[in-house]
């Protein structure tokens, strides 16, 4: 089974989590492709998306992921054959905590993509080891693939 991992990061935290999940999935025998800020044309044939994103500014997607989701929102393509999950990183100090993860989820569902498990929202204020925290969530993602 092939999994496309997309990361959007401003300070690198989401990128580190995405790379860690990529390594864990490969160790478990999955085929993966890891993209840091892809274009839609890079991933339009991928059927399983794991999106790992931080929240930037006033609840925005990071600059390296925003163009993809703008393009996706404006696309006429049917994404009903795409299954996805989202991992969001943010700070609960802000009222826009993990808004980028919410935007990713809403955009994909508006395009008929199928969410396969609950979104993981990591509060960077309370979780020191975000990579391990995300790894603990990974079995629910894998279960959703079945």
Swiss-Prot record:
The free-text function statement in the UniProt record for this protein reads:
Probable electron transporter required for biotin synthase activity.
InterPro entries given in the database record? Flavdoxin-like, Flavodoxin/NO_synth, Flavoprotein-like_sf
Which residues are in the Flavodoxin-like domain?
3-142
Record organism: Haemophilus influenzae (strain ATCC 51907 / DSM 11121 / KW20 / Rd)
* One Pfam assignment: Flavodoxin_1
Record keywords: Electron transport, Flavoprotein, FMN, Transport
What family does this belong to?
Belongs to the flavodoxin family. MioC subfamily.
Q: Gene that codes for this?
A: mioC
Which stretches are transmembrane? none
Cofactor(s) recorded in Swiss-Prot or TrEMBL: FMN
Give an example GO molecular function. Answer: FMN binding
Q: Which PANTHER family match?
A: NADPH OXIDOREDUCTASE A (PTHR19384:SF128), NITRIC OXIDE SYNTHASE-RELATED (PTHR19384)
- Entry protein name: Protein MioC homolog
């Amino acid at each position: 089974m092939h999994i496309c991992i997309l990361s959007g990061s401003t300070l690198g935290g989401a990128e580190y989590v995405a790379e860690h999940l990529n390594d864990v999935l490969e160790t478990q025998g999955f085929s993966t492709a890891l993209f840091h800020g892809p274009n839609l044309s890079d991933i339009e044939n991928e059927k399983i998306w794991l999106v790992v994103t931080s929240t930037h500014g006033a609840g925005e997607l990071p600059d390296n992921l925003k163009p993809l989701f703008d393009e996706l929102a404006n696309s006429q393509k049917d994404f009903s054959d795409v299954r996805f999950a989202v991992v969001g990183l943010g700070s609960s100090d802000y009222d826009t905590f993990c808004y980028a993860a919410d935007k990713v989820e809403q955009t994909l569902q508006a395009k008929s993509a199928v969410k396969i498990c609950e979104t993981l929202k990591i509060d960077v204020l309370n979780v020191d080891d975000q990579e391990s925290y995300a790894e603990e969530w990974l079995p629910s993602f894998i279960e959703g693939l079945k």
